Amino acid sequence: MANFLFEFEKPLVELENKISDLKKFAEEKNIDVSRELELLSAKAQQLAKEIYQNLTPWQRVLLARHPERPNTRDYINYLCDDFIELKGDRRFGDDPAMIGGIGIIENIPVTIVGNLKGKDTKENIMRNFGMAHPEGYRKAIRLFKQAEKFGRPVLTFIDTPGAFCGIGAEERGQFQAIAEAIATLISLKTPVLAVITGEGGSGGALALAAGDKLLMLENAVFSVIAPESFAAILWKDSSRAQEASELLKLTSEHLLEFGLIDGIIPEPLGGAHRNPAETLKAVKEEVVKNLQILKETPVEELLRRRYQRYRYIGSGIVEGGVS
């Protein structure tokens, strides 16, 4: 059960705690409360459906940022029978906000690259909250090209508020590194599968997303800017982030409707943080299925489709929906 709660989750968690306390009391006193537990459990299940099947875009943003969602390291550990991490961009240094290496998934050698957030405050500071520097993106580019050289498919995991925008990052060519990462992926002569697992923030996310297929977890988000920043720029009021999230159309359902992603990976009721094991299993099933499909497709066909995809991406979107 999650230790970190959002306001809209509290009624459910309070009820679940009540059920847990009642079970403990019944065991200690050796009394039968099975009927009461059955009624409370049914009530909790119904309340969970009411909460999580009617989430607003802002609530999905909050879930995408939940500190107890599985991170890229969790996915690597679950998916891979073996994984060798590779570090450094061979130009400046390594970036802990970006993890990359070679893994074996169901006997398929795969190059894996992803944003990496921390599990606690100390690790988040070390990993810069998943916001990569130029050396992180250049490390990714190095691994993309290595994958192409050895004929390995590329799998990326995206979970970042965006690329780091500090002075040092800009001085070291952040914009150029992101642009080169996008260009490299689009022209890469090997299959590329991308999965947005949490936050997909701006160019920092797009640098890992320009592949043959782009999947999103149900409660992940993908947008050109964070709702708070959108509100601060447009209305000079970051407190209107909830309103901004409605306008950004950043949920997986919106993006699938617009044709900007290829599929949605369902999350357990309540979100990935409430049942990480089920989430990891669902992601592995989709990753293995899509990797096998992409591996069976000739590289020339992948490149042709990829060019068409990004040459005309968004061209069917008009005001009010999809044309």
From Swiss-Prot:
One of its GO terms (biological process) is fatty acid biosynthetic process. It catalyses: N(6)-carboxybiotinyl-L-lysyl-[protein] + acetyl-CoA = N(6)-biotinyl-L-lysyl-[protein] + malonyl-CoA. It comes from the Bacteria. Residues 36-293 form the CoA carboxyltransferase C-terminal domain. One of its GO terms (cellular component) is acetyl-CoA carboxylase complex. Its EC number is 2.1.3.15. Pathway: Lipid metabolism; malonyl-CoA biosynthesis; malonyl-CoA from acetyl-CoA: step 1/1. Its main location: cytoplasm. GO terms for molecular function: acetyl-CoA carboxylase activity; ATP binding; carboxyl- or carbamoyltransferase activity. The keyword Lipid metabolism applies. InterPro entries: Acetyl_CoA_COase_a_su, ClpP/crotonase-like_dom_sf, COA_CT_C. Keywords: ATP-binding, Cytoplasm, Fatty acid biosynthesis, Fatty acid metabolism, Lipid biosynthesis, Lipid metabolism, Nucleotide-binding, Transferase. It is an enzyme of class 2 (transferase). NCBIfam families: accA, AccA_sub, PRK05724.1. Belongs to the AccA family. HAMAP family: AcetylCoA_CT_alpha. This is Acetyl-coenzyme A carboxylase carboxyl transferase subunit alpha. It comes from Carboxydothermus hydrogenoformans (strain ATCC BAA-161 / DSM 6008 / Z-2901). The gene is accA.
